[in-house]
């Protein structure tokens, strides 16, 4: 990616970011990432841990960048172009667009499923 516009490398807790990640920009976190805002097409977010987007994910998302195969990507409006978890990449994933979805890694393959709350 071209330009890192934000990073937050302090300790292992979740990092909170707010705003829109615009095309050509990249936001990184050395732990879990919580983003309140949107990720536009052509933008990228990357976290060592899990990624949760309270907004629309239209760009690229990389979770588990530190090798965690248990990491996941969750977005309220999941419309990602490319996703990666640990060392597994999935381009133009097939799923129901425009809803709350969660990407997980299982048997070395990324699955994207509708996120349902079970309480």
Which residues make up each language-model segment?
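Intrinsically disordered, low-complexity terminal regions
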Residues: 1-23, 64, 69-119
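Short, catalytically relevant binding-site loops at active-site mouths
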Residues: 34, 41, 52, 59
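Well-ordered beta-strand positions
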Residues: 26-28, 44-46, 104
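Surface loops and adjacent helix of pleckstrin homology
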Residues: 38, 56-57, 88, 115
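Extracellular beta-helix/beta-solenoid repeat scaffolds
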Residues: 45, 55-56, 71, 78
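A short, contiguous structural element within a folded domain that forms the immediate neighborhood
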Residues: 18, 23-24, 30, 36
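Short, T/G/N/S-enriched strand-turn elements that build extracellular solenoid repeat scaffolds
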Residues: 21-24, 39-44, 61-64
């Amino acid at each position: 990616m071209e330009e890192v516009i934000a990073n937050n490398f302090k300790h292992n807790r979740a990092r909170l970011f707010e705003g829109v990640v615009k095309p050509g920009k990249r936001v990184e976190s050395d732990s879990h990432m919580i983003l309140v805002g949107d990720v536009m097409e052509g933008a990228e977010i990357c976290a060592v841990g899990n990624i949760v987007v309270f907004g629309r994910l239209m760009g690229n998302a990389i979770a588990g960048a530190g090798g965690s195969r248990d990491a996941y990507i969750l977005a309220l409006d999941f419309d990602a172009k490319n996703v990666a978890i640990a060392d597994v990449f999935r381009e133009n994933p097939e799923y129901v667009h425009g809803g709350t979805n969660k990407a997980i890694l299982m048997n070395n393959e990324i699955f994207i499923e509708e996120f349902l709350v079970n309480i």
